[in-house]
């Protein structure tokens, strides 16, 4: 028996040394070497974008947000699965014990006379006890790296789940900043909108008076009425937007509605022009790209497992058992066993081939997902930079409009003082200045929101 077991083990080891194991490789995905637009001098960092109040709100959101908590729980579950898979490397042990109490088979015979006839009667009485215990150890030799690749697949899945935490953190920080800056812009626009509404109402009354005097056509009243309706709608929109942004902050901070109302203010000055690293380095920091890469790693590991399933498996086992009806029998009747199990797939090749083809298809799909994720990530970064340039150009145009409107208002005020123009005409030039100032605030909001979106698209830098 020992000779047979040894021969089987040697045969398996020879197979391990001579056969060619699975050698699946990960697909290559090209990445551009340069950006289409030039970059600035400052390193990407949130520190230049935050005031203390916004930083505190972001910290509270990162601590209390439910999306991050759910992602953390999913990661913990994936880690537990990976740890369970790693246990397959360790030897497995078993322990069993049993006890029985059957009726004894000892019997006695006696004669009974019935009607002068002697009849033998046999009876069995009493109980007996029997106890037993056994212990065993088993271990599978990882000839073709099958167990290691199975564990690697679970670990890659766990790492892919971890990236959801990073993605959630980036998203939460960006959303908090956007809501905070939107509230700041609303706060800055509100007094301007209220002043513009008051000026428009006064202009409407003056225009009606001039129409009654025959100095203007009635159509001028309709034009000012349209402006008044627009001013009222703008002020109502600001109030509604403020409530919506407070609700967004409440959800992000896991607080009851209507949410906080911070004394927010837009950052002073222009957003910095960030210096970007090489595309490959930037993309490697993005959570979505990391998740796609871990998906490829997991699929590749599963393909290697399916390849290894086509090769023999070798496992060893050892056991020790004993038992008896008395304690002295436990030491006098032990039974030891050693075993070697060699599984060679010879008639299941079709199923194994289909399993391997399915794993290869999964790897191809994961590679396509990675390629698509890389392309979308590049497009996202370039889009944010293009939009930032567009907003900068719009802001420069707005500066020219504001200068022109301010100069027109100054000249109109001088002409009104000397009686060259009516008060309604001067009020309209003043309203144009207020409109340009509100447009400037909205563009500055877009500028900083785009900066936060760029930071998010860079993977946190």
Would you name each region that the model predicts?
Residues 1-8:
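Bacterial N-terminal signal peptides that target proteins for export
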Residues 12-35:
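Bacterial Sec signal peptide processing site at the extreme N-terminus
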Residues 20-25, 52, 72, 88-167, ...:
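Small/polar-residue-enriched beta-strand and adjacent coil segments characteristic
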Residues 31, 37-38, 215-217, 236-283, ...:
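Short, solvent-exposed, mixed-charge loop/turn linkers that connect secondary-structure elements
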Residues 36-64:
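Regulatory alphaC helix of protein kinase catalytic domains
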Residues 63-66, 379:
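Surface-exposed, polar/charged faces of alpha-helical domains
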Residues 70-85, 168, 172-209, 224-227, ...:
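Amphipathic alpha-helical coiled-coil segments
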Residues 212-240:
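Repeat-solenoid scaffold signature
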């Amino acid at each position: 028996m020992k000779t047979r077991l040894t021969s089987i083990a040697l045969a398996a080891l020879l197979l391990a040394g001579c056969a060619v194991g699975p050698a699946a490789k990960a697909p290559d995905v090209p990445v551009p070497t340069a950006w289409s637009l030039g970059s600035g001098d400052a390193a990407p960092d949130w520190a230049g974008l935050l005031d203390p109040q916004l930083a505190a709100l972001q910290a509270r959101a990162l601590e209390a947000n439910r999306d991050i908590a759910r992602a953390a729980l999913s990661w913990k579950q994936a880690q537990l699965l990976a740890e369970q898979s790693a246990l397959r490397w360790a030897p497995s042990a078993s322990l069993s014990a049993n006890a029985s109490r059957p009726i004894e088979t000892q019997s006695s015979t006696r004669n009974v006379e019935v009607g002068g006839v002697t009849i033998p009667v046999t009876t069995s009485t009493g109980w007996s006890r029997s106890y037993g215990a056994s212990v065993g150890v088993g271990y599978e030799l990882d000839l073709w790296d099958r167990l290691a690749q199975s564990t690697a697949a679970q670990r890659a899945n766990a790492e892919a789940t971890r990236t959801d935490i990073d993605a959630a953190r980036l998203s939460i920080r960006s959303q908090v900043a956007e809501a905070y800056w939107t509230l700041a812009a609303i706060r800055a626009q509100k007094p301007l909108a209220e002043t513009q509404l008051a000026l428009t109402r006064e202009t409407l009354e003056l225009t009606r008076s001039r129409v009654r005097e025959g100095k203007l056509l009635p159509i001028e009243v309709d034009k000012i009425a349209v402006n008044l309706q627009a001013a009222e709608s703008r002020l109502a929109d600001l109030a509604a937007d403020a409530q919506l942004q407070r609700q967004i902050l409440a959800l992000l901070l896991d607080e009851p509605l209507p949410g906080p109302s911070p004394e927010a203010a837009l950052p002073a000055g222009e957003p910095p022009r960030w210096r970007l690293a090489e595309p490959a380095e930037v993309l490697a920091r993005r959570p979505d790209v990391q998740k796609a890469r871990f998906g490829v790693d997991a699929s590749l590991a599963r393909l290697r497992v399916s390849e290894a399933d086509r090769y023999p498996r070798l496992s060893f086992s050892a056991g020790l058992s004993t038992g008896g009806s008395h304690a002295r029998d436990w030491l006098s009747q032990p039974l030891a066993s050693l075993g070697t199990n060699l599984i060679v797939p010879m008639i299941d090749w079709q199923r194994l081939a289909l399993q391997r083809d399915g794993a290869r298809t999964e790897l191809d799909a994961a590679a396509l997902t990675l390629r698509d994720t890389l392309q979308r990530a590049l497009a996202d970064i370039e889009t944010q930079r293009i939009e930032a340039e567009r907003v900068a150009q719009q802001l420069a145009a707005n500066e020219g409009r504001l200068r022109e409107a301010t100069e027109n208002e100054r000249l109109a005020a001088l002409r009104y003082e000397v009686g060259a123009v009516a008060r309604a005409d001067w009020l309209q030039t003043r309203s144009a200045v207020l409109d340009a100032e509100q447009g400037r605030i909205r563009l500055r909001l877009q500028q900083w929101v785009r900066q936060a979106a760029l930071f998010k698209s860079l993977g946190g830098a």
